[in-house]
């Protein structure tokens, strides 16, 4: 069966930047993130052996999530200058190597990945999502697996359950309960991975947890009841969009490798 590789370029970029010591050209231009990224790209291509592929980056500017919740990602520090200046040349090099580079304004890289994986299902193609972002685990099913950037392991449904304690179809509930400090999404105070997984295992989704909240005892019960008003918004913020139109990609044929690419 044909296979589509979707690379979370923004996630890879930051990991590459922090993985290597600062490197520069003879004229002082930083290149460490570029070098690290290209090495990771080569490794993941070898591991996944795709027939089609795309590297997806976040677009600059705000997205529909900022419209839903203006404080979304408000606590993030600005991108370091020595990383920012590497983005444009990196995108050009990746494209020159034969990869399809996608940047879609108004949505995040996660949403492009989700929408392309949905397109792949419609076309009968399996997807490999290369990322270190736990949010994308919600996409995993019989047609989608995660290739973790940290340990180069593939995670199917059983792998997601083993790693997080919840199945992929409950990852949205799990993520909403915990919130996300990096993205400034409030969760239930004091609810970490173990508590979130316990509630999901015991009660099920957010609606069932909400129904059980009045009977929950102790401080964590108080925290849950206090956080209930925001839970629906948290669910919306952590849900990956899977129905976005991707400019330049009408079918997976637009993501095919030509002979000698990559």
Residue ranges and their predicted role:
Residues 2, 23-24, 74-249:
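Extended two-metal-dependent nuclease catalytic cores across DNA- and RNA-processing enzymes
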Residues 63-65, 137-138:
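Short catalytic/ligand-binding loop motif for oxyanion handling, primarily in non-cytosolic enzymes
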Residues 254-262:
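Short, intrinsically disordered, charge-balanced linker/junction segments flanking boundaries
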């Amino acid at each position: 069966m044909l296979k589509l590789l979707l690379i979370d370029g923004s996630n890879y970029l930051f990991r590459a930047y922090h993985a290597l010591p600062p490197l520069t050209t003879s004229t002082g231009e930083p290149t460490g993130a570029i070098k690290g990224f290209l090495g990771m790209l080569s490794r993941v291509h070898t591991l996944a052996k795709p027939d089609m592929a795309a590297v997806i980056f976040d677009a600059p500017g705000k997205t529909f999530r900022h419209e839903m919740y203006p404080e979304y990602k408000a606590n993030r520090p600005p991108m370091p200058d020595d990383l920012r200046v590497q983005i444009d040349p990196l995108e050009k090099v990746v494209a020159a190597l034969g990869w399809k580079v996608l940047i879609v304004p108004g949505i995040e890289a996660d949403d492009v990945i989700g929408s392309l994986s949905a397109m792949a299902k419609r076309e009968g193609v399996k997807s490999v999502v290369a990322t270190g972002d736990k949010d994308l685990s919600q996409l995993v099913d019989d047609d989608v697996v995660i290739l973790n950037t940290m340990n180069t392991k593939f995670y199917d449904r059983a792998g997601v359950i083993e790693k997080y304690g919840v199945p992929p179809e409950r990852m949205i509930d799990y993520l909403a309960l915990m919130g996300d400090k990096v993205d400034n999404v409030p969760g239930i105070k004091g609810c970490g991975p173990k508590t979130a997984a316990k509630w999901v295992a015991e009660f099920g989704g957010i609606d069932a947890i909400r129904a059980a909240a009045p009977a929950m005892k102790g401080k964590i019960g108080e925290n849950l009841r206090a956080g209930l008003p925001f839970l629906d918004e948290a669910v919306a913020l952590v849900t990956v969009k899977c129905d976005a139109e991707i400019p330049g990609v009408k079918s997976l044929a637009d993501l095919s490798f030509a002979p000698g690419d990559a």
